[in-house]
Amino acid sequence: MGKVRIRLVKRTARKLLEKYPDLFTGDFEHNKRVVSQLIEYRSKKLRNQIAGYITHLVNMASKRKKAEEASARI
């Protein structure tokens, strides 16, 4: 089974991605630094969870885009 993320992590990650889509990549370390600059959380664990979920969303979007391009070629 996968890990369950709390609603705060998902909501914050989606808002950040919606507001700053060009700042985030598929690299967790990069996203971690960007998240720490954009939001002021005291918890390192929460920052890492948000950055990890953003990384997951970015990677899933890129996989979805590649699959759509491949199906369009066929």
From Swiss-Prot:
Pfam families: Ribosomal_S17e (PF00833)
Family that this chain belongs to: Belongs to the eukaryotic ribosomal protein eS17 family.
GO biological process: translation
GO CC terms in record: cytosol; ribonucleoprotein complex; ribosome
Keyword Chaperone tagged: no
Highest rank taxon of the organism: Archaea
Name used for this protein in its record: Small ribosomal subunit protein eS17
Cited InterPro entries: Ribosomal_eS17, Ribosomal_eS17_CS, Ribosomal_eS17_sf
Keywords, sorted A to Z: Ribonucleoprotein, Ribosomal protein
Gene that encodes it: rps17e
The species this protein was found in: Aeropyrum pernix (strain ATCC 700893 / DSM 11879 / JCM 9820 / NBRC 100138 / K1)
Alphabetized GO MF terms: structural constituent of ribosome
Transmembrane intervals: none
Coiled coil segments of this chain: none
HAMAP family xrefs: Ribosomal_eS17
